[in-house]
Regions:
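Short, Lys/Arg-enriched N-terminal segments with co-localized hydrophobic residues
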Residues: 1-6
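Bacterial N-terminal signal peptides
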Residues: 13-24
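Ser/Thr/Asn(+Pro)-rich, low-complexity disordered segments
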Residues: 29-471, 511-515, 519-520, 524-527, ...
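Aromatic-rich carbohydrate-recognition surfaces in CAZymes
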Residues: 394-414, 425, 466-505, 546-554
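Alpha-helical scaffolds that organize eukaryotic protein assemblies
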Residues: 485, 495-502, 506-524, 559
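Short secondary-structure subsegments characteristic of cysteine-rich extracellular domains
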Residues: 499-508, 569-580, 584
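Active-site rim elements
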Residues: 540-544
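Active-site neighborhood of glycoside hydrolase catalytic domains
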Residues: 547-580
Length: 801
């Protein structure tokens, strides 16, 4: 596929232009075979044309300009914190933390955020330090290169005049390197955007003491509107106030650079200055999943180049999801910065090591103990809504993907329950998933297509912006999950379609540096610990709403990796799951009370942006969905919410208070609004499945009782709803199992230990999707507490000895 990529690109772009020129709709694309699966070698033209603008969204995505210094055919990132930089003339919203950088027609504006909006939802970007040049008028900003959490771009005027800028997430520093430009520095006005400050900045030396310009040397500090910056330069540099009020920078030799550091205070300049002269040229996150220890070990590597002889190491900051639960020695004795993601603690160096526990994930739960009436209820739901229904499955990648995972869950429940509906459900799942994972020329929907310019697989029909890679991990995680489960249930599916399913997984989570077909970790921000949803980015950065679906995409990777025997895929899934689940807790729910700004009046948020938090969603202001979208889809992968004792109950109590207040407010605001009770029944079937699916990780017995009550109510449309089949089963299983015992782990990533809070009984559970029996050992710390022999293609459970 890699060798043929150039030929496919030439053919496709030619046929795109001809098709558009003639105004025809072309649906034929070549078939690219992968095992028994396949995909279309090019995206469909004419399928997604806006009725008003007549713009074809697919052609626009493939054909839009990407701002690069050199386009060597490398896979172009999408969904990144710097995405706007790749796709706009002047990239903005580059939140490196604790600062934001905007490229402008004058150079760059550096906003050092030190406070929040009055309601606590935004990190304020005010009074920037501006880096430009004498008569410097860049025509655009162009990406020069990127690492796992760094990006370099060129503020470009001509081949002989430019400024290269390097940014790194968590690096409170901006590196500027000049060619043919005499630098100028000045203080911007309140909102930046080319405005000038009304007040004159103050200046200080590397020792933090005031100085008066002109100054000659290697360091100058600037204090403006409560913000302190350290400016490091080559020896012999002169800083002087010019006739226009800007600071003229004159280097003693050819070329030159300026390094701008954010400082908590003047006294911190010396520390930053010492580390300013090593510019990061690449960053890499390396990881190892230790099955025996139940640990994820990561190494954060910063490759630097010296701007002066002997310089090495950078100041690197880390956020709460990284340092709070870290088991390695990590010296974070440098400056600290308050951010909208909590305290960023800094250390200095080129390599930083961490270790975090991973206690397993399961695709479902086994039949344990007395399942009560749940088995009978589930049997009826499986028969009515899955085995005997003629209702078609979704035709776009979001709803089609969700349906596939629901069917996979239903098939798994049927297998565990020994229910007679298994065969019919499994057959329908296989038929539909196989259809999605293969392409037939001329078909209108349910296939994947290759974007040769942007390098990625997009499913059609697309939905919610997925044609430009928005929500890619949400959608495609469902397919990967379904493929993993079906690989267990159907002995031939993995050999036939496993390679194609793995290709879909790589599209959103490419973990292999050697596989250049896709950008690395397309949707994941390794430093922030969570994914970003938008493929194009915005002027304010990027965002993510549904943490539940993001976590699900990583759980799916673990499951498919185990089903295919691909340890690298599994390890990547563990890495993503460990960090995304921690980030979901920390930054959407603030369980420790030290992340949300003090003025923020809610206990959770529905969405986060690069520099802000949002009480809301893209589609509603109702708390039922602000909370609920974080719990989509229900399943064992959400068990991480139980890591913090009492968090599930505390969070749900917060939801109920918010929903009650919302109902009161809407009733007063809108005459036509009918106030709804804050009950499970009022949520409807699908949404209720997410709420109950979350609550069962806190008090499964209570959820089971509520389901029984709803089931017995005449005309019930919630407990009888198709979305509830797996919730009935899993809640009943958890009623017997209890909650995850976070002290314990198994030697398989698809195993867990549960402990019942009342009986004290602990139970080991393990999944084996393979063709041979597996033995899984279980440990509490380093003490072995039992083992399970798991038959092929099954799930097993047993009591801890």
């Amino acid at each position: 596929m890699v060798e043929g990529g150039g030929m496919k690109r030439v053919v496709l772009l030619g046929y795109l232009s001809v098709s558009l020129g003639l105004g025809r709709v072309v649906v034929g694309q070549e078939v690219v075979r992968v095992g028994e699966g396949s995909y279309a070698g090019g995206p469909p033209v004419g399928k997604m044309v806006d009725g008003k603008t007549k713009v074809d969204a697919v052609v626009e995505t493939e054909g839009r300009r990407v701002y690069l210094v050199e386009d060597g055919g490398r896979a172009v990132p999408s969904n990144k914190w710097y995405q706007n930089l790749l796709l706009k003339q002047y990239g903005t919203g580059l939140w490196a933390m604790p600062h934001r950088v905007d490229a402008t027609k004058e150079g760059i504006e550096i906003f050092y955020s030190t406070s929040y909006s009055g309601d606590g939802v935004r990190a304020l970007t005010e009074f920037p330090l501006v880096v430009g040049g004498d008569e410097f008028r860049p025509v655009d900003s162009r990406v020069k290169g990127w690492g796992d959490w760094t990006v370099a771009f060129r503020s470009y005027e001509s081949e002989g005049r430019w400024m290269d800028v390097t940014l790194g997430e968590g690096m409170p520093t901006v590196w500027c390197e000049f060619r043919g430009v005499v630098p100028r520095l000045w203080a911007g006005g309140h909102g930046g955007g080319g405005s000038r400050a009304e007040r004159v900045p103050g200046w200080f030396g590397v020792d933090g003491k005031p100085v008066t310009l002109p100054v000659k040397g290697a360091a100058l500090g600037m204090r403006h509107e409560g913000r302190c910056y350290g400016i490091s330069a080559p020896e012999g540099t002169e800083f002087a106030i010019g006739a226009d009020g800007r600071v003229a920078v004159t280097f003693a030799g050819e070329g030159g650079f300026l390094v701008i550091s954010m400082l908590p205070a003047e006294k911190d300049f010396a520390v930053s200055h010492e580390r300013a002269y090593a510019v990061p040229r690449d960053t890499r996150l390396e990881w190892e999943y230790d099955r025996e220890a139940g640990q994820l070990r990561t190494e954060w590597v910063v490759e630097t180049a010296p701007l002066k002889p002997g310089a090495k190491g950078v100041i690197q900051g880390f956020l709460p999801h990284q340092w709070r639960d870290n088991g390695e020695r990590l010296e974070l004795d440098g400056p600290e910065f308050g951010t909208i993601r909590g305290v960023m603690k800094c250390g200095a160096g080129e390599r930083f090591r961490m270790s975090h526990p991973f206690r397993g994930v399961l695709p479902g739960l086994p039949a344990v103990g007395e399942m009560g009436g749940a088995a009978e209820r589930v049997s009826g739901l499986l028969r009515e809504h899955f085995a005997e229904t003629k209702k078609p499955l979704g035709t776009d990648t979001y709803w089609g993907g969700k349906d596939l995972q629901r069917y996979a869950q239903a098939a798994l429940v049927a297998a565990e329950a020994g229910d007679g509906s298994r065969g019919a459900i499994e057959a329908r799942l296989k038929e539909s998933l196989s259809d999605w994972l293969s392409y037939k020329p001329g078909e209108a929907a349910r296939y994947f297509a290759w974007y040769p310019r942007r390098k990625g697989l997009v499913g059609f029909n697309a939905a919610y912006g997925s044609e430009h890679f928005t929500d890619t991990h949400f959608h495609q995680g469902y397919f990967v999950h379904a493929a993993a489960v079906l690989s267990q249930l159907d002995a031939g599916f993995a050999s036939a379609y496993g390679e194609m399913a793995a290709l879909v997984a790589k599209n959103y989570a490419n973990w292999d540096r050697g596989d250049e077909r896709f950008p690395r970790l397309r949707t994941f921000d390794v430093w922030r610990g969570h994914s970003y949803a938008d493929g194009n980015g915005f002027p304010e950065g990027n965002n993510q709403e549904s943490t539940g679906e993001a976590v699900n995409s990583w759980a799916a990777l673990i499951l498919l990796g185990e089903a295919l025997g691909d340890e690298k895929m599994t390890a990547a899934g563990v890495m993503g799951y460990v960090f995304e689940s921690r980030a979901a807790e920390e930054y959407w729910f603030d369980p420790h009370g030290d992340v949300f700004p003090a003025a923020y009046e809610h206990e959770a948020c529905g969405m986060i942006w690069s520099g802000s938090i949002v009480w809301g969603t893209w589609f509603t202001a109702s708390p039922s969905w602000i909370y609920g979208i974080q719990w989509v889809p229900s399943g064992p992968q959400l068990s991480f919410f139980g890591r913090e004792p009492g968090l599930v109950e505390r969070v749900y109590g917060g939801y109920e208070r918010e929903q009650e207040a919302f109902e009161v407010k809407e009733t007063a605001r809108r005459k036509e609004y009918r106030r709804q009770p804050v009950t499970t029944a009022a949520l409807g079937g699908e949404l209720a499945s997410y709420h109950l699916g979350f609550r069962m990780h806190g008090d499964a017995a209570k959820v089971v009782k509520e389901l029984e009550t709803l089931w017995n109510e005449p005309g019930d449309k919630v407990a009888h709803n198709e979305w509830m089949a797996s919730v009935h089963w899993q809640a009943a299983a958890l009623k017997t199992l209890g909650r995850v015992d976070w002290r314990c782990h198994g030697t398989s990533p698809v195993s867990m230990v549960y402990g019942h809070p009342e009986t004290g009984v602990r139970t080991m559970v393990a999944w084996n999707p393979g063709a041979a029996a597996r033995t899984v050992k279980f440990f509490e710390g380093k003490k072995e507490i039992g083992e399970l022999s798991v038959p092929p293609r099954s799930m097993a459970s047993g009591r801890v000895r």
